[in-house]
Amino acid sequence: MPLNRTLSMSSLPGLEDWEDEFDLENTVLFEVAWEVANKVGGIYTVLQTKAKVTGDEWGDNYYLVGPYTEQGVRTQVELLEPPTPALKRTLDSMNSKGCKVYFGRWLIEGGPLVVLLDVGASAWALERWKGELWDTCNIGVPWYDREANDAVLFGFLTTWFLGEFLAQSEEKPHVVAHFHEWLAGVGLCLCRARRLPVATIFTTHATLLGRYLCAGAVDFYNNLENFNVDKEAGERQIYHRYCMERAAAHCAHVFTTVSQITAIEAQHLLKRKPDIVTPNGLNVKKFSAMHEFQNLHAQSKARIQEFVRGHFYGHLDFNLDKTLYFFIAGRYEFSNKGADVFLEALARLNYLLRVNGSEQTVVAFFIMPARTNNFNVETLKGQAVRKQLWDTANTVKEKFGRKLYESLLVGSLPDMNKMLDKEDFTMMKRAIFATQRQSFPPVCTHNMLDDSSDPILTTIRRIGLFNSSADRVKVIFHPEFLSSTSPLLPVDYEEFVRGCHLGVFPSYYEPWGYTPAECTVMGIPSVSTNLSGFGCFMEEHIADPSAYGIYILDRRFRSLDDSCSQLTSFLYSFCQQSRRQRIIQRNRTERLSDLLDWKYLGRYYMSARHMALAKAFPEYFTYEPHEADATQGYRYPRPASVPPSPSLSRHSSPHQSEDEEEPRDLPPDEDDERYDEDEEAAKDRRNIRAPEWPRRASCTSSTGSKRGSVDTAPSSSVSTPSEPLSPASSLGEERN
C-alpha cells in the first residue's frame, strides 16, 4: 500500500526534533470510535473535523472504523466496494462467517473511507465473547448494561477485522490503530492479548469516573489522589466500564488525553500518566476580508432581535441597540457546565446594572436540551403578535407610499391629514391593543416536564430574575437544540453563536470544551475556566487572554463565591465596553482561530502516531524519548494596541508574574487614535501564524536560553510538544 512520501517531524515548529524521517510507505491507519458516522457526543465532532487533515497526511491508507447504524448509513455514508484486494478479501471472509461488515465513504469534508461493523447482527456471539473477555482480561460485563454489551461486541468485531486484514494482506503493512474512549477500548485490549502486530493508541476524551464524581458535587480536583477508584466506581455501578477504560489505557502503546487537566485526572483515576496531550481542533474557514465575519454577526444578531421583539412583547421597554446577548450551551449538566455559577453571576450583574443606572440590557440564553412536552403558549403567542404587527405596519406603509407617490406625481405636496384614513388608525390601535400583557415574559420557551424540580428554573425562582421591566438582565431558557425550522427561534446553532456578543462557559468539569472554541473561530468572545481543557490551552499559549476576548475564570484556586464574583466582574466590564471596543475585540478573537485549526493541532496526533510506531515496530522506526526543554513553547504577547476596555487587560490566573506591567489606560479618543486595525491585524497574525519556535540543539538537550516571550517554566513530565507548563498542569504539586 504505497503512500509515496515521507514526513519529517523536524519540519513542524515547536515539536521535538527527530533524527530520522518517518517513512509512511506500507503503513495503514485505522481510527476506531463508536461515533464514526454516528452522532452521539463531542467525539463525533473531533472525528468529523479532523478527517480532512488526517486524510491529507495518510491518503487512501486512512480508514475509520465504527458501528453500523441504519440512520447513519442512510444519511451520511455512501456504500462502496473496497478499493484494495486485501480489504475486499477481509470483508468477504467476515461476512461469510456470520458478520455484517459494510464499506463506504463518509460524506463529510475530506470524504474519509469507513468500515462499519453491524453490532446487532453479531449478538449471537455475545455470551461466548463475554466469557473470553473474562478469561483474557478478568472483566465481567452484566447482562443489563446494553451499552457495555455493545462495547464488547464492537471490540471483538474490531479485533477480528484487524486480524483478518493483516492475514489477507500479501505485503504485511505496519498498522496503526487509534481507539477513542472506553466504548472502543475492548478492541485495543484484545489486539494486545492476541499479540497482533498493531501499534495501538488510546485517547480518552473524558474519564468515566471523573464525570460521575463531578456530577456528585464533590471537591474533585483537591481530592484526586484520595479517591478509592474501585470503591467509587462500584458504588456508581460502572465498575465494569471503568475496568474497560483502565485496561485500554494500560494496554496501549501510547496513551493520550485531550488536555493537561484531563492528563492529571487520568494519571490519578486510570493510574497511567498520558504520553502526550492531543488537543481538539476545528476546521477554520478564513474570510477574504476582515469585515466579512463582522457583517455575519450583524445579520445573525438581527435574527435574534426579531425573536426578542416577539418574546418580550408588551414589556419591550429596553433599547435593542443597547442590548447584549450572552449565552451558555451544551449538555444539561447543571453544575458540571457551570450553569449554577452563570445564574448567580447574572443576578449580581443585574444588581450592578440597576444601582449604577446603566442603559445596557443583557439577554442571557440557556441552550440546554431537557425534557419538555410542548412549546410555551405565551412564547408562541409572542411570535404571532410580532408577525401581526409586522404585517399591519407593512399594510399601512404600502397605502401611505402609494398616496405619497400619486401626490408627488401631480406635482403637489401631500396633505398629511389625508394620508391615513380612519380604517388605518383602527388597524393600528388594534395592533397596539394586542401587545398589552398582564404577566411577565416567560423565562422558559417550552413546558417542562419537571418544572418544579428543574435546576435552572428552581435557581431562577430563588434569585428572582423573572424578566420584569425593572430587571436589566433578562433570562431565556431554551431547552431544545436550535434549528432553522423552529417556529420560535428559526436559526441553527452556528448562526445563533455568530449573533451573540459573549459565550459564557464557566464549567467545573470540561476535559476540552468545543463551545468556547467554536466561539473563537467565529470571532465571538467567550468565558472559559482554568478547569477546562480549552481554558488551560489558551492560558498556555496567550500572554493576556482577556485582551483577545478569552476570559479565563479561576475555578481551581478560588472558592465558589469568589469565582461568581470574578465572573460578575468579567460580565460587568464587558457591558461597559463601547460598540467600537467590542468590534476591535471580535477582530482579535477571530485572529486566534489559526491556533485552533486542525492544520496546527493535527501535529499532536501526528506525534502520537509516530511514537506508537516506534514502540510497536522498533526495528523499522526509531524514537529517542526525552524531556522537552524549557524553550519548547511560545506565548502570544498582548495585542499591539491598548486593551479593549480599561479594566480587562489582566491575567485571570492568580499566579501571574507580579512584575508584568499593565497597559496604561487611555481616554476613548486617544484609544481610537492609537488603534490602527490593519496594523494590529498584521502584528497579531505574525504572532499567531509564525511564532519564533526555538529548535533544540540535539535530542537529548534539556536546557535552552530565553528568547522573546518563550515560557521558561520547568516542563511537565507529560510530553506536550510546543506547550509550556500551565497552572493547571501542576495541580498535583499545588494540592500538596
From Swiss-Prot:
- Signal sequence bounds: none
Q: PTMs?
A: Phosphorylation at Ser-8 by AMPK inactivates the enzyme activity. Primed phosphorylation at Ser-657 (site 5) by CSNK2A1 and CSNK2A2 is required for inhibitory phosphorylation at Ser-641 (site 3a), Ser-645 (site 3b), Ser-649 (site 3c) and Ser-653 (site 4) by GSK3A an GSK3B. Phosphorylated at Ser-641 by PASK, leading to inactivation; phosphorylation by PASK is inhibited by glycogen. Phosphorylated at Ser-641 by DYRK2, leading to inactivation. Dephosphorylation at Ser-641 and Ser-645 by PP1 activates the enzyme.
Annotated UDP binding lies at K39, R331, T515
First-tier enzyme category under EC: transferase
Q: Could you tell me which pathway this protein works in?
A: Glycan biosynthesis; glycogen biosynthesis
Q: Which residues carry this modification: Phosphoserine?
A: S8, S11, S412, S641, S645, S649, S652, S653, S657, S698, S709, S726, S730
Task: Describe activation and inhibition of this protein.
Answer: Allosteric activation by glucose-6-phosphate. Phosphorylation reduces the activity towards UDP-glucose. When in the non-phosphorylated state, glycogen synthase does not require glucose-6-phosphate as an allosteric activator; when phosphorylated it does.
Bias class Low complexity marks the residues at 714-727
Q: Locations of Basic and acidic residues compositional bias?
A: 682-695
Highest taxon listed in the record's lineage: Eukaryota
Q: Where is alpha-D-glucose 6-phosphate bound in this sequence?
A: H291, E292, Q294, H297, K301, H501, R582, R586
Any one of the GO CC terms: cytoplasm
UniProt cross-references to SUPFAM superfamilies, sorted A to Z: UDP-Glycosyltransferase/glycogen phosphorylase
Its GO biological process terms? glycogen biosynthetic process
> Where is there biased composition of kind Acidic residues?
658-681
* Modified positions (Phosphothreonine) in chain numbering: T700, T720
InterPro entries named in the record: Glycogen_synth
Annotated positions binding UDP-alpha-D-glucose = H205, R211, R331, E510, W512, G513
An MF annotation (GO) of this entry: alpha-1,4-glucan glucosyltransferase (UDP-glucose donor) activity
Quickly give the catalysed reaction. Answer: [(1->4)-alpha-D-glucosyl](n) + UDP-alpha-D-glucose = [(1->4)-alpha-D-glucosyl](n+1) + UDP + H(+)
Q: How does it assemble?
A: Part of the GYS1-GYG1 complex, a heterooctamer composed of a tetramer of GYS1 and 2 dimers of GYG1, where each GYS1 protomer binds to one GYG1 subunit (via GYG1 C-terminus); the GYS1 tetramer may dissociate from GYG1 dimers to continue glycogen polymerization on its own.
Role description? Glycogen synthase participates in the glycogen biosynthetic process along with glycogenin and glycogen branching enzyme. Extends the primer composed of a few glucose units formed by glycogenin by adding new glucose units to it. In this context, glycogen synthase transfers the glycosyl residue from UDP-Glc to the non-reducing end of alpha-1,4-glucan.
Annotated family: Belongs to the glycosyltransferase 3 family.
What name is this protein filed under?
A: Glycogen [starch] synthase, muscle
